[in-house]
Amino acid sequence: MDIDDILREVDPTFHSIPQEKRDLQELTRAWIAERSAPELLAWPADGLFERINDNIKQQIEKVEEMTGDMDPKTNFALIVIQTELERYRYLVRSYLRARIAKIDRHTLHYLSTDDLRARLSEMELAYATRHQALLHNHYLSSFLSSFPANLQNLNDAAAGISMIETPDLESAVFIRALKDTPVEARGVDTDAYADLKESDIVILRWADAKKLVEAGTAELV
């Protein structure tokens, strides 16, 4: 289920909203989710960022055209467009920075399997691959070259213990129910079960909340 299907169920009028406004809503949701989740979420695969980038380019062109017109009647419209443009830019920059920070922190983890690599965009994958290569070369020139060859790998799993650092999936997140749904939460001493109503907000371990978010029955807040 993609975000359009989720939003259509939650708000039947969603597709009557202009595409530009829907894209802004989806971008905002993606930004909030990425900043809230302890691990990297999947890159939007519905062409969202291509449309966002096209819209930003169009707004920049419009601002450039209107800047040459000093008619006081157009000044207010120019301010509105510039404000909207800055909002788009802020959301995109903040979203990408949140993702890059996660990639930098756990590069080997996100390069370790095809499923994890699929979460990255093409540019992010190229960045992560190059970043890890540079880091490994730096370690080799600094100290790893003095180690035996079998101890120079950064992804060693000797004795069944992996050297790859992974995100903390047990960290807490806030989620909002998008529909009535049952919730199972694992505790230290016992597990808990609850029935969430639409719009209810609860705090859960990400490991428990993840399946609800991926199924589209809840969103990160």
UniProtKB/Swiss-Prot annotation:
InterPro entries: GINS_A, GINS_bundle-like_dom_sf, GINS_Sld5, SLD5_C, Sld5_GINS_A. Pfam families: Sld5, SLD5_C. Component of the GINS complex which is a heterotetramer of SLD5, PSF1, PSF2 and PSF3. It comes from Chaetomium globosum (strain ATCC 6205 / CBS 148.51 / DSM 1962 / NBRC 6347 / NRRL 1970) (Soil fungus). Its main location: nucleus. The GINS complex plays an essential role in the initiation of DNA replication. Has a role in chromosome segregation. This is DNA replication complex GINS protein SLD5. The keyword Metal-binding does not apply. One of its GO terms (cellular component) is GINS complex. It comes from the Eukaryota. Keywords: Chromosome partition, DNA replication, Nucleus. GO terms for biological process: chromosome segregation; DNA-templated DNA replication; double-strand break repair via break-induced replication. It is found in: Nucleus. Belongs to the GINS4/SLD5 family. The keyword Nucleus applies.
